[in-house]
Amino acid sequence: MSRTIQVTFDAHDPETLSRFWAAALGYVNPPPPGRELEDGQDVFEAWHDFLREVGVPESQWNSSSAAQDPDGVGPRLFFQQVPEDKAAKNRVHLDLRAAPGLQGDERMAALETECERLVGLGATRVERHE
């Protein structure tokens, strides 16, 4: 029997990372428990309202955040705030497959398009590999 997994990341700013990864993967940031979002309502505003109502101090509102596959297929991503700086190279990274099945110029064009989209979301392009 397979198991459902959650991938957990340490972060300085969980909300920003979960926003980025939700947009990058086509995921969603889940609303607070028992809440449905009104049309156009920002999920993080809903979380802030919820946390205020249950008495969580504002200093702790960005202590964790999540992004999940709206179809329930991919793993949930959980971001937890940690005070320390990163001490070493990341031991986990996510590889996005932006051009499965494509080859040659068509593949590179699809990869460039995806790279531009991710940079627009806040990613940093390090280098290009052919």
Predicted regions and their residues:
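Glyoxalase I/VOC metalloenzyme domain signal
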Residues: 1-125
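Intrinsically disordered, low-complexity terminal/linker regions enriched in Pro/Ser/Gly
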Residues: 126-130
